[in-house]
Amino acid sequence: MAASSLEQKLSRLEAKLKQENREARRRIDLNLDISPQRPRPTLQLPLANDGGSRSPSSESSPQHPTPPARPRHMLGLPSTLFTPRSMESIEIDQKLQEIMKQTGYLTIGGQRYQAEINDLENLGEMGSGTCGQVWKMRFRKTGHVIAVKQMRRSGNKEENKRILMDLDVVLKSHDCPYIVQCFGTFITNTDVFIAMELMGTCAEKLKKRMQGPIPERILGKMTVAIVKALYYLKEKHGVIHRDVKPSNILLDERGQIKLCDFGISGRLVDSKAKTRSAGCAAYMAPERIDPPDPTKPDYDIRADVWSLGISLVELATGQFPYKNCKTDFEVLTKVLQEEPPLLPGHMGFSGDFQSFVKDCLTKDHRKRPKYNKLLEHSFIKRYETLEVDVASWFKDVMAKTESPRTSGVLSQPHLPFFR
């Protein structure tokens, strides 16, 4: 391929990534668009119940009247009565209606509770992902502390597809121990909320806390969990994650390791992904950066295998493998033009760990192993059975290191519409 043609392709992909980052920042700004002087209104939550509907909560503070809501586009609705709706918009609306039938309940510890968003007390922000922000919250009826992802509904079709994909995957993956569990959902006119189990932190923040490598024994257990989660998604639901990276790998003080954030996951058709979604440049596989035919994406789950390999090199060494890159363009160029990164021989990694990472980072995706082959690798086999006290290691790291976020949680006036 001519250099100029490749540069144009990389520039377009870089522009797409920048646009997605701007959209993500815009969603966060919308979620935090509450000034300290402005009273926070009570969210009105429509609930489905026995085929009918229950009127929203009438709780409101007489001292703090609800301000007029700003006009917003409703999900899947035409802007005028005469605007024809696309089949995709109709499908999005139909999927939302199906999810609406399940909203307004939390199932925690085998118990099902009728609930609404105002039954949750906001304890502060935990972070942000592809689709929105994550808040630490307490369910007032039981005292359970959970994580709640807030995603802004809009008239943007791509954003709405992300929301529905994230919802669809977490709701269906209740039987996988390696995927973060969903307790229930709440849907309002402006937002979608997913209530999930509370995990401790992500692998990216752990790396920052430690300011160095994560031990191989921990990465061994992490690899087993993530490969099995990805294999489950592919085999059970025909889904490719497309955003495997350290910030989407969660750990907790019980030693659990789970995969999260399915906003840009894609459906597989004949085991192939047929749609493009940018994801994160730093972890993107070569075949996604420079496909043979950009108009017809045709990659498979081995793109996620590459992303896992890059993540393992980063976590095992404490450094991102493509160094000194100031732009996405530079990263994408290095991925295509340089040899794949490997685990350094001088850092004392086992032979099977080095071999596993080398297999994941096979540049020719046709020679890169799929999940069934990876699950047979000696590195996976070893850590499937080897006892590793992840819980004690995690607690020790959290106790002896400082959070990379100096602010802890947001100050109360800037929290969203929870009371």
Swiss-Prot record:
Means of activity regulation: Activated by phosphorylation by specific MAP kinase kinase kinases such as MAP3K1/MEKK1, MAP3K3/MEKK3, MAP3K11/MLK3 and MAP3K12/DLK.
Binding residue positions for ATP: M126, G127, S128, G129, T130, C131, G132, Q133, V134, K149
GO cellular component, one term: nucleus
Effect of R162H: In a colorectal adenocarcinoma sample; somatic mutation
Gene3D superfamilies registered for this protein in UniProt: Phosphorylase Kinase, domain 1, Transferase(Phosphotransferase) domain 1
Enzyme class: transferase
Domain of life, per lineage: Eukaryota
Active-site residues per Swiss-Prot or TrEMBL entry: D243 (proton acceptor)
Assigned keywords, A-Z: Acetylation, Apoptosis, ATP-binding, Coiled coil, Cytoplasm, Kinase, Magnesium, Metal-binding, Nucleotide-binding, Nucleus, Phosphoprotein, Serine/threonine-protein kinase, Stress response, Transferase, Tyrosine-protein kinase
Catalytic activity annotation: L-seryl-[protein] + ATP = O-phospho-L-seryl-[protein] + ADP + H(+); L-threonyl-[protein] + ATP = O-phospho-L-threonyl-[protein] + ADP + H(+); L-tyrosyl-[protein] + ATP = O-phospho-L-tyrosyl-[protein] + ADP + H(+)
Primary localization: nucleus
Sequence positions bearing N-acetylalanine: A2
Biased segments, Basic and acidic residues type: 18-30
Cofactor requirements of the protein: Mg(2+)
Residue numbers spanned by region Disordered: 18-76
Molecular functions (GO terms): ATP binding; enzyme binding; JUN kinase kinase activity; magnesium ion binding; MAP kinase activity; MAP kinase kinase activity; molecular function activator activity; protein kinase binding
Annotated spans, D domain: 37-57
Localization of this protein: Nucleus; Cytoplasm
InterPro entries tied to this protein: Dual_spec_MAPK_kinase, Kinase-like_dom_sf, Prot_kinase_dom, Ser/Thr_kinase_AS
E.C. code: 2.7.12.2
Region DVD domain, residue ranges: 377-400
Any one Gene Ontology BP term: response to tumor necrosis factor
UniProt domain comment: The DVD domain (residues 377-400) contains a conserved docking site and is found in the mammalian MAP kinase kinases (MAP2Ks). The DVD sites bind to their specific upstream MAP kinase kinase kinases (MAP3Ks) and are essential for activation. The D domain (residues 37-57) contains a conserved docking site and is required for the binding to MAPK substrates.
Designated name of the protein: Dual specificity mitogen-activated protein kinase kinase 7
Gene name of the encoded protein: MAP2K7
